[in-house]
Amino acid sequence: MLDDMLARMLNQIHHGDCIAGMNGMPEGSVDLVFADPPFNIGYEYDVYEDSRSRHEYLDWSRAWIAAAHRVLKDDGTFWLAIGDDYAAELKLLSQEVGFHCRSWVIWYYTFGVNCKAKFSRSHTHLLYFVKNPAKFTFRADLLENRIPSARQLVYADKRANSIGRLPDDTWILRPQDLEGCFSADEDTWYFPRVAGTFKERAGFHGCQMPEQLLGRIIRFCSNEGETVLDPFSGSATTLTVAKKLGRRFLGFDLSLEYVQRGRDRLANFQVGDPLAGAAEPTASAPATPGKRASKARPTTIANTKAATKTPALSAELPFENELIDAFANTSQSFSPASLR
């Protein structure tokens, strides 16, 4: 039976500091925490100061992570989204508080932030922790949590495991991999960063997460009817996805504007509504219009396999065809004697 205090807090966004808010919650009352805190990189929020000293930021991070650890159930799960600057430090802080790291996931988007004096930033770290490594929720049994293997996705091989496989720990997005486009991947996930032109963008928060990404996390690490907490509600994407997937939810935010807009967003959706954005991966390769490779191309083991098993790739991926040709030429000239 739900604690009366928790029951009064559920299915709402609360205006206020998340540390004070979580410290006011019953201990061990939440099943999943997803946190996307400020990165301390000088982003202009309307209330929060995102340019703290390193020492102050880490002390503050330890405080809210400890509060999240306290409210999680013994079999609860904690996900932390963070940028490069403090990913390693916050991983160590989380472990010092008592969390156990299961995976360090990289969410990679190829249309990232352009930089002039360093390599462009095009990824975010997603740290996956559990409170008790001997008892936690990970729904590998759900068909909706599995993805087609390379045999299924690229080759349509009937010998492939019909239930697919579990995703790996690299989640990738390129603009050409949005809905309606073919993704010839074997072991990567494709999720868009929510750009300003995307339909699912809430329009009032510059750091919005995609619903499909949160959907995968919530489906894997919680069950229907369980409670999801977001200490930094922001655009309310975590809570919106939790609601759509039939979870109880609650969140905190310092910004009254974000709280009000998040509440408005939540009011527009019901349990069972579809998640925004393109589901991935594509179930099969669509037919590709256009000419196939030239018949004059020399027949080799490499390019014959490409032409017979993946015709869609021949027209769509000229760079890959160049690699196939290069490999074929190399294999023709290779002999054991060349190694002597």
Regions found by a protein language model. Name each.
Residues 2-22, 263-304, 308-323:
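S-adenosyl-L-methionine
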Residues 268, 330-331:
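Short, flexible coil/linker elements and helix-boundary hinge sites characteristic
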Residues 1-261, 301, 306, 317, ...:
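Core catalytic lobe of class I
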